[in-house]
Amino acid sequence: MFRKVYLILFILSSLSLSCEKEKNSDPSFSLNLSGKKGGVPVRIDWIYKGFPGEMKIYELASQRPVQLWDTNTVSDLDLAPVSSLIEDSKLVLGPGETRKFALVYKNETKDKLYFFAAPHSVNPPEFGFGFKFKCLCVNHLFQVAPGAIWYRIVEIRTMPNWASDPFQITHTLVRVDPSQAKEWNNMGNHSHSDE
């Protein structure tokens, strides 16, 4: 009796493992984007861990020159170097393009907020090749005073022969307790934005 039960469990676990392997690895998969032309929709998404509100993306104001990674807070959105909201956080990118835009967050709480961004991920992952996103996941702790509007100038750069299907880039924004932020700030462990 025990032998039969053991045999059945062994067969079921073998089938389960082979099904799991098939789901995670397709040896016949080979990405081929030849013939793809034109603009590709790229959505910028966010996951929030204790972080209230939402991060939005904006076009840059042409009359206000900015540098990559400029980061600041302002009391009113009109004082930020931005123009229009990018609807659905969706950019359309082409080969060889350099696209700067602004990440914008309004702290509507009564507390100073500290946060960082975990490294971004691309979904589907096969479209993660051929571009560079100079963003906010640079091992840096950011802060926003109550009622303030925080912004950061970022950039996506595609290779001249870049081709893709639509995909999304997702960052996780993690709220940091003020005591932890103070400890990290005292340690002086910051990344440099040019890394």
Label the predicted regions:
Residues 19-82, 100, 183-195:
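Membrane engagement elements in two modes
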Residues 111-134, 159-195:
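Terminal connector regions
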